[in-house]
C-alpha cells in the first residue's frame, strides 16, 4: 500500500521516513506535470534515485533541494516488501541563478556516492537538450502519424532524428510530406529473413538517446541490442503476456476475450517479453468483429505508446529487477 499525504511546502522528511511506501503531491498542482509558469524565476526539475534502502535517504535529498532554495512539489517513494532497495522520484521548482545546473548535478552526485546509489538522474526540461529518438516502423503507420502530430503540437518532448522502415512509401503520402516539411529524414531499408539490415540501422541511430518501435514487425537481435546499448521501447498490439508474436489481435478475437489491450514495453532478446511500461484496455463483446477489434486496438496502441514515452521522458520509469518496472 502507498500512503499518500498532502503538503504545501518543503518536505518534513523525518516525519515521513517511517512509511516504507508513500508519496505526496502539492495540492496546488493536483498531481499534474509541473509548469514553469508558476513563477518567472522558478523552473521545474525532476530527480530519480535508486539505492539500497537505509534510514535518512529522503531527509538528505529533501534537505539538498531546500538548502538551494528549491521547493518540492511532488515526491514518490517505493520500497518493495522484503527487499533492501529504495526508489524515489521528486518534482521540484528552483531558481537556476541560485542553483546552477552543473552545481545541481554535483550536489545530487554527492548524495549518490553517500548512499551507494545504483542510479541518480536529474532532468531540467527547460535547460537540458530534448531526448533524441529514432522511430522504426513497418507497413502500419497509425502510431507514427499520432506521434508526429503530437510532436508538432509540442506534446511529445523529444527531437525526432529520423524514421526508418522496411516498407517503401510513396513520396506524395501524408507521412512523407509531413517528414519533408519538418526536415525529418526517412530511410527505407528492406529486410529479409536472412538480412535484417541491423548494421545500417545502428549507423543511422548513432547519437540517439532511445529508440521507439512504432509497429516495427521485425525482431531485433541480441547483437543489435548490445551494439546500441540504450533503451528500445516497443508498442505491442496485444495485452501481454498473453497473445505474443504475430497477429495478437486475431489471437485475441479467436480466444473470445472480453477485454482487448495494448502494451508498451522495453525490448529484450526474447520476443514480446521485456519489462512492461504501460498497458491500456477496452471492453469488447460478441458483437465485435475482427475489423472492430483492429480499430479498437489501433486506438489503444496510439494512446499507450504516447503515455509511455511521456512517462519515460519525465523520468517516471525505473527498472525493478530484471522483468519489472517502477512507474511513478
Curated annotation (Swiss-Prot):
Its EC number is 3.5.1.10. The keyword Nucleotide-binding does not apply. Disruption phenotype: No visible phenotype. Puru1 and puru2 double mutant shows a 70-fold increase in Gly levels and accumulates elevated levels of 5- and 10-formyl THF. Embryo development arrests between heart and early bent cotyledon stages, and mature seeds are shriveled, accumulate low amounts of lipids, and fail to germinate. Puru1 and puru2 double mutant is only conditionally lethal and is rescued by growth under nonphotorespiratory conditions. Puru1, puru2 and fold1 triple mutant shows no photorespiratory phenotype. Residues 1-12 form a transit peptide. It catalyses: (6R)-10-formyltetrahydrofolate + H2O = (6S)-5,6,7,8-tetrahydrofolate + formate + H(+). Transmembrane segments: none annotated. Keywords: Hydrolase, Mitochondrion, One-carbon metabolism, Photorespiration, Transferase, Transit peptide. It comes from the Eukaryota. InterPro entries: ACT-like_dom_sf, ACT_dom, Formyl-FH4-Hydrolase_C, Formyl_transf_N, Formyl_transf_N_sf, GART_AS, PurU, PurU_ACT. GO terms for molecular function: formyltetrahydrofolate deformylase activity; transferase activity. One of its GO terms (biological process) is one-carbon metabolic process. The keyword rRNA-binding does not apply. Expressed in leaves, cotyledons, roots, seeds and flowers. GO terms for cellular component: mitochondrion. It is found in: Mitochondrion. CDD domains: ACT_F4HF-DF (cd04875), FMT_core_Formyl-FH4-Hydrolase_C (cd08648). Residues 46-129 form the ACT domain. The active site is at 272. Deformylase involved in photorespiration. Prevents excessive accumulation of 5-formyl tetrahydrofolate (THF), a potent inhibitor of the Gly decarboxylase/Ser hydroxymethyltransferase complex. Belongs to the PurU family. This is Formyltetrahydrofolate deformylase 2, mitochondrial. It comes from Arabidopsis thaliana (Mouse-ear cress).
Amino acid at each position: 500500500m502507498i500512503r499518500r499525504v498532502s503538503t504545501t511546502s518543503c518536505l518534513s522528511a523525518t516525519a515521513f521516513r517511517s512509511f516504507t511506501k508513500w508519496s505526496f503531491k502539492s495540492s496546488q498542482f493536483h498531481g499534474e506535470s509541473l509548469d514553469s509558469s508558476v513563477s518567472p524565476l522558478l523552473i521545474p526539475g525532476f530527480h530519480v534515485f535508486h539505492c539500497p534502502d537505509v534510514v535518512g535517504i529522503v531527509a538528505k535529498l529533501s534537505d539538498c533541494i531546500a538548502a538551494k532554495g528549491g521547493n518540492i512539489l511532488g515526491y514518490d517513494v517505493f520500497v518493495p516488501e522484503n527487499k533492501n532497495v529504495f526508489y524515489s522520484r521528486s518534482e521540484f521548482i528552483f531558481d537556476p541563478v541560485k542553483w546552477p545546473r552543473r552545481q545541481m548535478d554535483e550536489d545530487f552526485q554527492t548524495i549518490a556516492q553517500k548512499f551507494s546509489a545504483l542510479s541518480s538522474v536529474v532532468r531540467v526540461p527547460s535547460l537540458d537538450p530534448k531526448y533524441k529518438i529514432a522511430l522504426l516502423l513497418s507497413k502500419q503507420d497509425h502510431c507514427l502519424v499520432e506521434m508526429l502530430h503530437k510532436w508538432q503540437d509540442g506534446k511529445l518532448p523529444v527531437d525526432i532524428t529520423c524514421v526508418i522502415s522496411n516498407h517503401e512509401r510513396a513520396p506524395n503520402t501524408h507521412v512523407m510530406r509531413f517528414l519533408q516539411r519538418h526536415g525529418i529524414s526517412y530511410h527505407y531499408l528492406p529486410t529479409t529473413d536472412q538480412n535484417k539490415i541491423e548494421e545500417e540501422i545502428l549507423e543511422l541511430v548513432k547519437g540517439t538517446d532511445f529508440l521507439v518501435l512504432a509497429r516495427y514487425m521485425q525482431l531485433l537481435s541480441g547483437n543489435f541490442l548490445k551494439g546500441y546499448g540504450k533503451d528500445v521501447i516497443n508498442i505491442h498490439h496485444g495485452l501481454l503476456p498473453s497473445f505474443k508474436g504475430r497477429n495478437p489481435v486475431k489471437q485475441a478475437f479467436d480466444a473470445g476475450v472480453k477485454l482487448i489491450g495494448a502494451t508498451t514495453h522495453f525490448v529484450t532478446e526474447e520476443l514480446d517479453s521485456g519489462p512492461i511500461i504501460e498497458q491500456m484496455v477496452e471492453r469488447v463483446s460478441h458483437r465485435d468483429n475482427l475489423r472492430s477489434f483492429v480499430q479498437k486496438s489501433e486506438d489503444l496502441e496510439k494512446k499507450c505508446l504516447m503515455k509511455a514515452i511521456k512517462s519515460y521522458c519525465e523520468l517516471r520509469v525505473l527498472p525493478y529487477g530484471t522483468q519489472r518496472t517502477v512507474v511513478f
